[in-house]
Amino acid sequence: PDGLVTGVQTCALPISAIDGAGVQLVRLVGNNDVKEFDPFLLFDAFDATDPATYLKGFPWHPHRGIETVTYLIKGEIEHGDSLGNVDVIEEGDCQWMTAGSGIIHQEMPRPTDRLLGGQLWINLPAKHKMTEPRYKPIVGKDIPVIEEKNAKIRVLTGEYKSTPGATQGDFVKAT
């Protein structure tokens, strides 16, 4: 279709980073390349086997005008926020947090043999930046799984081969 971009447009090199209260991670998007990936502002991946590198977590901090999507493959993370939500993200779970007009939250990993997952920051469109903040936990058992060859594909949002995701974004649609 007209306007469809095909092929590789940009290669982003990941960098090692430390965020929160000292959590070691790999930043795949969000260095100096934000304009090229909008509406995706940041994507961090974390894979740690030494609790000393992640247990200080991400203490109380604010967000505004974005959504964060955290997906956990291994481990557990405690979530709390200024809306009164308290939750534990477990293996295979996802959390979708809309900061909108503003939210304060924390994500504190629990000690485990391995903490593995990622977090994506999505820029809200200008007309939705001041929307009401909200928190949406997505339990792993509610995420559709498609098996292909040697892979299991978990469909968090959007649609893959006619299988709808566990949730649909209200502001930025998966294509």
Identify what each model region corresponds to.
Residues 13, 69, 120:
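Terminal peptide-recognition signature
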